[in-house]
């Protein structure tokens, strides 16, 4: 998994979610 540079501690992944990233361990990762 590649870190997308977005945190998802308080809110879900927003911008990076459009790039295919998902929340894992409080950080947005791309599979």
Swiss-Prot record:
The keyword Disulfide bond applies. The lineage of its organism: Eukaryota, Viridiplantae, Streptophyta, Embryophyta, Tracheophyta. InterPro entries: Cyclotide, Cyclotide_bracelet_CS, Cyclotide_sf. This is Cyclopsychotride-A. The presence of a 'disulfide through disulfide knot' structurally defines this protein as a knottin. SUPFAM superfamilies: Cyclotides. One of its GO terms (biological process) is defense response to bacterium. Probably participates in a plant defense mechanism. Has antibiotic activity. Inhibits the cytopathic effects and replication of the human immunodeficiency virus. Active against both Gram-positive and Gram-negative bacteria. Belongs to the cyclotide family. Bracelet subfamily. Disulfide bonds join 4-21, 8-23, 13-28. The keyword Disulfide bond applies. Keywords: Antibiotic, Antimicrobial, Disulfide bond, Knottin, Plant defense. There is a cross-link at residues 1-31 (Cyclopeptide (Ser-Asn)). It comes from Psychotria longipes.
């Amino acid at each position: 998994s590649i870190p997308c540079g977005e945190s998802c501690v308080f809110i879900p992944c927003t911008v990076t979610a459009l790039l295919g990233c998902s929340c894992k361990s409080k950080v947005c990762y791309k599979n």
